[in-house]
Amino acid sequence: MAAMMQKSAFTGSAVSSKSGVRAKAARAVVDVRAEKKIRVAINGFGRIGRNFLRCWHGRQNTLLDVVAINDSGGVKQASHLLKYDSTLGTFAADVKIVDDSHISVDGKQIKIVSSRDPLQLPWKEMNIDLVIEGTGVFIDKVGAGKHIQAGASKVLITAPAKDKDIPTFVVGVNEGDYKHEYPIISNASCTTNCLAPFVKVLEQKFGIVKGTMTTTHSYTGDQRLLDASHRDLRRARAAALNIVPTTTGAAKAVSLVLPSLKGKLNGIALRVPTPTVSVVDLVVQVEKKTFAEEVNAAFREAANGPMKGVLHVEDAPLVSIDFKCTDQSTSIDASLTMVMGDDMVKVVAWYDNEWGYSQRVVDLAEVTAKKWVA
């Protein structure tokens, strides 16, 4: 049901009250863990960087301590764009400029630095444990490795990695394979985070022979507001005026977290004039004969079990805006599940390509933190 979808506290939904006993217990947990938190820096304070900070701020008992942000715009831009967001609305937190190199979020001070060269960042002197790499630029071993050269211990790339030997993780699918010795990891793409969980269910329950995917995806900052030069001639066209066919590696990338599917999936993207929330349309041939109700039952079992909080099954006839700021990686539109000839399965799944993805970045960062303090 729509009412069951998890919403963040700072999108306007009510927060349930806790008893005094529970509140004291929660504070005790925080006190115990405080000295064990890892120090986190965000490199690139764009859409994912700011969504990540809001998601992190909404967590309780987190093992992450965000202490620095590298943003070329400085404190004025960082504080203003964090507080006021055209998609997310006004941040309920108290965001202030402390001085020319610090902002505060509900009293929590965060240092703002500005350098386009990761080698010049003060990660060593700040004892940074983990860098959230959110620029979309430093996504290979050489680029991301510059953060480690600058003194950070680890890097989490918020995009598909360019080097095959950088491990990729999708929470709900293969995060259990994470090892503390990995210096650089990738959280894959937002579309892979939507696709991989329910594809895993299909593979385990029915066996996938082959398939294709189309993601109808909200426009992103990589596109042009008006027609202008771009390496992709379709993305060169005005994003708010067109449906823009383009490439996506999301389907192929599923095999990075589900090796049994290597060579079995492919797909394309259609960029559309909406600011956030996208939808995947997957068609696969399966080995085991099935029917729509059985497919949805498999999704419900996963949503109530091992993929709780990552996968959601929606029965109401909703539209894209209804999925804005949903915490899950993927919301199956149950009424649109189809089976043709008992072995061709069509699944439609919604996802907030900014918010839901950023929640998984926080989750994966927490996975690394738990290995640190174990």
Swiss-Prot record:
Keywords: Calvin cycle, Chloroplast, Disulfide bond, NADP, Oxidoreductase, Plastid, Transit peptide. Signal peptide: none annotated. The keyword Chloroplast applies. Its EC number is 1.2.1.13. InterPro entries: GlycerAld/Erythrose_P_DH, GlycerAld_3-P_DH_AS, GlycerAld_3-P_DH_cat, GlycerAld_3-P_DH_NAD(P)-bd, Glyceraldehyde-3-P_DH_1, NAD(P)-bd_dom_sf. Residues 1-34 form a transit peptide. Disulfide bonds join 55-325. It is found in: Plastid, Chloroplast. GO terms for molecular function: glyceraldehyde-3-phosphate dehydrogenase (NADP+) (phosphorylating) activity; identical protein binding; kinase binding; NAD binding; NADP binding. SUPFAM superfamilies: Glyceraldehyde-3-phosphate dehydrogenase-like, C-terminal domain, NAD(P)-binding Rossmann-fold domains. One of its GO terms (cellular component) is chloroplast. It comes from the Eukaryota. The active site is at 190 (nucleophile). D-glyceraldehyde 3-phosphate binds at residues 189-191, 220, 235, 248-249, 271. The record marks 217 as: Activates thiol group during catalysis. Pathway: Carbohydrate biosynthesis; Calvin cycle. Its main location: plastid. NADP(+) binds at residues 47-48, 71, 116, 353. The keyword Acyltransferase does not apply. One of its GO terms (biological process) is reductive pentose-phosphate cycle. It is an enzyme of class 1 (oxidoreductase). It catalyses: D-glyceraldehyde 3-phosphate + phosphate + NADP(+) = (2R)-3-phospho-glyceroyl phosphate + NADPH + H(+). NCBIfam families: GAPDH-I. Homotetramer. Component of a complex that contains two dimers of PRK, two tetramers of GAPDH and CP12. CP12 associates with GAPDH, causing its conformation to change. This GAPDH/CP12 complex binds PRK to form a half-complex (one unit). This unit probably dimerizes due partially to interactions between the enzymes of each unit. This is Glyceraldehyde-3-phosphate dehydrogenase A, chloroplastic.
